[in-house]
Regions:
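A generic structural signal for ordered secondary structure
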Residues: 82, 293-296, 300, 307, ...
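Nucleic-acid endonuclease domains
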Residues: 1-69, 89-257, 263, 269, ...
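Short acidic DE-rich linear segments
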Residues: 319-321
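Conserved catalytic cores of phosphodiester-cleaving nucleases, focusing on short active-site segments
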Residues: 73-75, 83-91
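Extended alpha-helical coiled-coil "stalk/arm" regions
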Residues: 260-296, 302
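Short acidic-glycine loop/turn motifs at beta-strand connectors
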Residues: 77-79, 129-130
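Conserved active-site beta-strand-loop modules that form the wall/rim of enzyme catalytic pockets
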Residues: 81-83, 120
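Beta-rich nucleic-acid/ligand-interaction surfaces
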Residues: 67-77
Length: 321
């Protein structure tokens, strides 16, 4: 039978209950049998396991011959432009550390084969206990832009060695607490393509292609899909994916509100002291008059400090907005 990627996901999770299953990785050589307890091994095993699962369930597929690029499986062997499935796995107790693709190969591939952008990523988040028992904690089915993000100095999260761009790396798409994440994953295919285009420009190895890359891609994509994509400029969208800047802006606004509130309260205290001063001056109470005047001067200094905080917070807001 033939299934779509979504149907494969549904069968794994809902019919076979993969989230309730347990397993082990066993290895034997000669008369020695062991249970593998190295957690890093699981990620590589899962693709082979899924292939065995597809065979066991009688699901048609054709394996990919190109191990350097997605997908791993063509779920429609008669049309290798549709129902493309890539399998990834990572230790759920850590962040995803798998590679998505070599950047240079990928930016060329999506021009020559725009349908590669429709690859479904079947991602397993696994755990292994000290006895080598493997369980699957989460399963996701995602598009590439739903698992990728920007980084500090690049529009795409990349593996960079000796200033040379290598692999596209994933972001964290499952974070419930955004305070622990500096950059959010892309919201759309269009934003993802914008980041790819800017990376082509920024990367010395691909910079010479940057001037025509977008136009070439858009022509190819329309020819393949019939759709005219509208790709935003990276400079127009990059800040919305920078959660650090968002948090800095929120903090600056909070600091501004606190400093403004403090400043208003100080002004009220100064007015109160002036009323008290007037009353004591009428009574000719020299001792209290002197003390109140000292209090007024102290509050004026506090007001100046609060005003400095207001100006500093406002300047930070202007910088970030």
């Amino acid at each position: 039978m033939r299934l779509t990627a979504q149907e494969v996901y549904d069968k794994l999770v809902n019919e076979d209950g993969i989230l309730q299953l347990e397993g082990q990785i066993k290895f034997y050589l000669g008369d020695v049998n062991i249970i593998v307890k190295q957690r890093d091994v699981v990620g590589n095993i899962m693709q082979e396991w899924l292939q065995g699962w597809l065979d066991k369930r009688g699901i048609e597929y054709a394996p990919s011959e190109n191990t350097q690029m997605p997908p791993d499986f063509f779920l429609n062997p008669d049309d290798k432009t549709k129902n493309l499935l890539e399998v990834k796995a990572f230790n759920r107790n850590r962040g995803p550390g798998f590679d998505i693709a070599d950047f240079r190969m990928y930016e060329e591939e999506i021009i020559n084969k725009p349908y590669m952008l429709n690859v479904d990523y079947l991602i397993f988040g696994y755990d292994m206990n000290d006895d080598g028992v493997v369980t699957i904690k989460d399963v996701w089915l995602k598009k590439v832009w739903e698992i990728t993000r920007r980084m500090e100095d690049w529009p795409i999260n990349l593996q960079i060695k000796d200033n040379v761009v290598h692999k596209i790396r994933p972001g964290i798409w499952y974070a419930e607490d955004t305070a622990r994440t500096d950059y959010t994953v892309f919201e759309s295919l269009e934003d993802f393509i914008s980041a790819i285009e800017e990376t082509v420009f920024q990367n010395p190895k691909t910079h010479n292609n940057a001037g025509t890359w977008k136009a070439t891609f858009l022509r190819s994509y329309k020819q393949e899909t019939g759709i005219d994509l509208s790709i935003p400029r990276w400079s127009e969208i990059k800040d919305k994916y920078d959660l650090k800047s968002v948090r800095k802006l929120e903090k600056a606004k909070s600091d501004l509100a606190k400093a403004t509130d403090q400043y208003e309260k100080i002004k009220e205290r100064i007015q109160l002291y002036h009323r008290k001063l007037h009353a004591e001056q009428e009574k000719n109470n020299v001792g209290k008059v002197g003390k109140i005047q000292d209090d007024i001067e102290k509050q004026k200094r506090n007001a100046e400090k609060a005003k400095e905080k207001i100006n500093k917070a406002q300047a930070k807001i202007d910088e970030l907005e």
